[in-house]
Amino acid sequence: MNIGFLTRRSSLRAGSVTVGLLLTLMSLSSTAGAQQKLSKRYPAAKNVRIELRNISGTIVVESWNKDEIRLSATIESKHALVLPRQIDQNLVINVMSDNRGKGDVGDINFKLQVPVNSIIDLETKRGNISVANIRSDLVRAHVSLEGDIELTNINASNVVAQNVTGNIFFEGEFSLGGNYEFKSNKGDITIRIPGNSNFRLVAASSARKIALNDFWNKNFKTQDGRRVVGDVGDGRSSVSVTNFSGQITFLRK
């Protein structure tokens, strides 16, 4: 057996592993070095308006028991700008405007902790939107291309959730006289509300996939299975649900 040959081959293997490891570490270091992190706090009234226009990346909003806003962001590209502005005590973040003409600026992932009564108005082209534990006049989430929307423990007078591709989940309550609109081109829409909810529903599904479950009653009128119109209880809230290719499901919580 040629021991020298085996030793040289082992050394080559060890060298290859070492080089591979170094390249991996260099890649991770480069990625970490290019990434920016932003963390800021702003004083806020209890009914402050939060307006965020993103391009790509996740948006997470949740309430906390403080009269201030805590903004955290992870910015993928060192060339991307995030310039939050307070206007009349409201917080405006417009990534689209701040980076106009720059081309692809990568993902920017946001997390905001806000007063429970904050008005929430969110948009992104790509990425998931999650909003939790808000009681206010408005919660709006709009994904213009692809991403899921999840609204949990929401009690708002007006709710708008729209996307093109992705699922929409709403769990909360319908307020007296409130307006609620849910719309997706491709994805499932699930609405989970108390069994004693009162609302007038207009639901449309080109795929004929509408499941009202416990909320179905004889007052509903259907049109070829593609459209359902009717009242649940006294119909004091207005609910519109449109889905072009996915399922519409109502669940009782």
Task: Annotate the PLM regions.
Residues M1-K253:
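Intrinsically disordered, low-complexity terminal regions
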